Swiss-Prot record:
Annotated GO biological process: translation
Stored PANTHER family: 30S RIBOSOMAL PROTEIN S18 (PTHR13479), SMALL RIBOSOMAL SUBUNIT PROTEIN BS18M (PTHR13479:SF40)
SUPFAM superfamilies assigned: Ribosomal protein S18
Organism: Mycoplasma mycoides subsp. mycoides SC (strain CCUG 32753 / NCTC 10114 / PG1)
Protein name (record): Small ribosomal subunit protein bS18
A Gene Ontology term for the protein's cellular component: cytosolic small ribosomal subunit
Family per similarity comment: Belongs to the bacterial ribosomal protein bS18 family.
Self-association state and partner proteins as the record states: Part of the 30S ribosomal subunit. Forms a tight heterodimer with protein bS6.
Keyword Nucleotide-binding on entry: no
InterPro entries for this protein: Ribosomal_bS18, Ribosomal_bS18_sf
Keyword Metal-binding: no
Key words, A-Z: Ribonucleoprotein, Ribosomal protein, RNA-binding, rRNA-binding
Amino acid sequence: MQVKKIKKRKKVNFFQKNNIKYIDYKDIELLKKFISPNGQILPRRITGTSPKDQRQLALAIKRARQMALLPYVIE
């Protein structure tokens, strides 16, 4: 019996692919792509973002939450 090996596809960095240099906290539609259904920021291993982009993304989401553009908890 042969065991099939599962190949993991490398995740593509969304921000480098679309040539986005600055993640704006006012761009709510973009930020919603990186938030889970219950309102948590998705980790790098799921989104495929680079460490630098993940830090900028988290900062932008936190700013949007403070400005009441995004909710803290989604019910």
